[in-house]
Amino acid sequence: MKRSAWLIAIILTVGCAKVLAVREIPGIVVGEPSFFRTIEAHTDAPIVAGNRIEVLLNGNETFPAMLRDIRAAKSTITFAQYLYEDGSIARELAQAFAERGRAGVKVNILLDDHGSGSVSSEIIDTMKQGGCEVEFFRRIDAEGIVFPWKLLRYNYRSHRRVLVIDGRIGFTGGYGISDAWTGDGRTPEHWRDTNARIEGPLVRFLQAAFAESWLETTGIAIGGEEYFPRLETAGNVTGQIVKSSPTGGSFQNYMLFLLSINSAKTSIRITNPYFMPDDVMTEALVKAAGRGVRVDILLPGEIDSQITYTASRSHYGPLLLGGISIYEYKASLMHAKTIVVDGVWATIGSTNFDNRSFALNQEINLTVYDRGIAQRMEQIFADDLKYSEPITYEKWHSRSLYERVMEMFAFPIKEQL
């Protein structure tokens, strides 16, 4: 059975999970002391100073930086990835991991079984023969057929992107390991994404996210100086690592997004590939626009799932009528998952703007309170708009009968897409 068919079977068998119902949101403002305390409380993630953050665009900036740091690893490498598929970058990374493994570095690799289940045995063997420990998160097997009530666990995936070298350097973002992520994101065959390289105290929390998933998968707790060294100040950026694991009843990234939107005074700029806001998020966005906040949303002109794209577009109407500007990126598939609020507060990570990310997947986001980084991301947003098409309410309202029918088919399962 194809892996997509597995998930459809799971959905039909066990039903769906949804985020918690938020009936009231506190009136906080970005930058005020109570804003930071409120964000920390609802995301269970401390906001920590002393970090160095480098924003990396697309594969042509991200993969060379990752490979450079991997090849310089001295003690440990931990790597968690949702999507790892055959191709030149997949082979190059596998060889780099294996080379470090042969040099005595401890290499722990965790791949999601749904997103990476089709990776070739050749690539896995390359890593294992180099001494790497390779595991698959929630391996899909025949157990769910024999015991159907156990199917539910397969619907909860690890969508996190984590790379930590020597416990001191970290990477996260929206990237996958595929040749689709190579290039500059301006041609159809090269997806557009945004990632980050991290040094400083925040790396410990990135490593903790990996340790959580590794423990669940293997029963092994990683630790010690090699994985969690003492981390000194590396820069002047303040931020947090927000991880969510909804199977534990937590929806931290949902609350991060919701509180950030509600706290905006001047501007909100959202870039996301899978955009299906619930009623609470939609209301928060429309209310922001109503109080004079400029709200711009950049979405893909096409994505790798037609039914998801159709379901996403069905949400445009209330937002457009509420005074929100929506754009669709045309140069390639837009896969970046970022938000910038008031030019000072920004987040980069794996979290899509949909129920699957908020309620079903393990996710991870880097959030920063830094004017320099936030303004860099606003400039990136402006550059992306040059390759995008604005969507008016009239254009959206005149969509074809076929699209409207597809929306009807997508509606019952949109919270699982």
Where is each model-derived feature located?
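Hydrophobic helical h-region of N-terminal Sec-dependent signal peptides
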Residues: I8-L12
